[in-house]
Amino acid sequence: MKLDRLTSEERMKRFYSGEKIDRVPFISSATMYAGNLMELSSEEFYFDVEKSYNAQKWVIDMHCCDGNPCLDIPNGEVLDFGGELIIRGNNCVKLPIVNHPIKNIKDAVNYKLPDVKSWEFLKKKIEFAKYASKKGISGVSITAGSSFTFVGSMVEMTQLLKWVRKEPELVEYLIGIAEEYILKSADIMIKEFGVENCSVSSNYPFENNAILSPKMFEKISMPSILRVHEKLREKGLKSFGMHLCGNHNKNLELFRDINLEEGSFISLDERNDLSMVRKILGDKYIYAGNVPSNLLVEGSPEEVYRASVEAIKIMKDNKHGFILMPSCDLPINTKPTNLFAMLKACREEGEYI
């Protein structure tokens, strides 16, 4: 296997500056996986920023990954919405159980965004970013939601989808509250770190084609997405990114309307066809993805290698570059040899120089 010609820091600095690099970058998204490998409890990984950061850094270095540690508390915004995360796992990292703050229509009608002083998730994001800064990591991510997905952290999804059909005005009311949360959070992060150090990321799991039809996506969620991006741009934010979680192949034409700035970062779930995404959204973005999660857990290194090479061949010559990544957050029970297979594919088939 060929060795790297650049360090990860050199590679990513050149990559984001549009300069030539040695090979396709490899980001593992190894968050909870790292906590589990380093034998942290769920409580330690989710809420002890020093332990979480350092666990991720050890694993990033061990697997020769690009990218940096990040705060990963699944459904963390529930804490800011007045709900509860029930933490499980004393000797390992497990997904928390969500207790939504809204149980019924009466709760929804009377729901107000809790006072900002009680936003524990946002406080933890700031704490993590400050710790990362001490370690030499600059840049802070501000969430753009989506608003509809955040409503899914206020109320259980099955209930929400019923309300989409039967109580659309109530859903619109909750989307407005989610927008309020997004924009207030952005103001706090900008004040804390400076607009020049902030970027914007958004995630769309509740808008995928298995949950909402493209028609419903356009009607229910897209107006808020456009409003939020417009208002964030008005605040001076210039760097944007998004993750298409789930199958969004029928939504791609609609996502063009966001008109993300050239060089924006778009990561893709395995259910999105790389060639189709590139054809519809164009070459003006950085793309990342999308090695299947089940393959990383159950597949052989040879299978992961082949899937990685296939993605690299499709996207390697994209104008603004391509990053090989898992389809979503790296599964906790991923085989370490399968991460090595992704690295091997980048080194052997992703060379530029």
Task: Please place each PLM-identified region on the residue numbering.
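Active-site loop segments of alpha/beta catalytic cores
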Residues: 1-36, 40-45, 55, 66-70, ...
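Ser/Thr/Asn(+Pro)-rich, low-complexity disordered segments
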Residues: 47-49
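Glycine-rich, N-terminal phosphate-binding loop and its surrounding beta-alpha-beta segment
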Residues: 55-87
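A contiguous, low-structure linker/loop signature
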Residues: 74-114
